[in-house]
């Protein structure tokens, strides 16, 4: 069974989280997710999420810490997911891959259809709501 390492970013500002909708030409088009992507060969997890944020949103981010890590199985693939808290970023958010970007309060997440693999981190965010 194939194992793919994927990083995601938890970006929080002014009581809202940044979420992105997958574009029409992407797998799982129309579903919402936290920005991020797949680890490349010989790349660290930290460098992966920083690269993905630059590629997907055209921002330079500063990481705070690893927030959550778990595995998710979809068909014949296991995804090892690593979500990092972002301390801050510079640059203007751009839509290079996603067709929509939104700042959303945690209490409103139920109004969005997320990738199934994001469900565990969303539950953790809700459980940890006092730290946000």
Provide a role label for each language-model segment:
Residues 1-2, 126-132:
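Generic C-terminal helix-cap and adjacent flexible tail
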Residues 1-18, 38:
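Conserved N-terminal beta-strand and adjoining loop/helix that marks the start
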Residues 11-12, 19, 88, 103:
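Conserved hydrophobic "DFG−1" position in protein kinase catalytic cores
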Residues 16-55:
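Conserved Nudix-box catalytic region and its N-terminal flanking loop in Nudix hydrolases
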Residues 56-63:
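Short secondary-structure junctions
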Residues 60, 70-92, 102, 108:
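Active-site-adjacent beta-strand/loop module that shapes the phosphate/pyrophosphate-binding cleft
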Residues 85, 94-125:
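NUDIX/MutT-family hydrolases
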């Amino acid at each position: 069974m194939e194992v793919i390492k994927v990083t995601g970013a938890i970006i929080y500002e002014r009581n809202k989280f940044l979420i992105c909708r997958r574009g029409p030409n992407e797998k799982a088009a129309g579903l919402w997710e936290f920005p991020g992507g797949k680890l490349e060969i010989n790349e660290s997890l930290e460098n992966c999420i920083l690269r993905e944020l630059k590629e997907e949103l055209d921002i330079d981010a500063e990481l705070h810490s690893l927030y959550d890590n778990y595995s998710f199985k979809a068909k014949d693939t296991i995804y090892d997911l690593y979500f990092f808290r972002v301390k801050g970023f510079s640059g203007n958010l751009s839509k290079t891959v996603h067709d929509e970007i939104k700042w959303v309060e945690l209490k409103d997440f139920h109004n969005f259809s997320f990738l199934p693999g994001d469900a565990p981190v969303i539950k953790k965010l809700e459980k940890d709501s006092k730290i946000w």
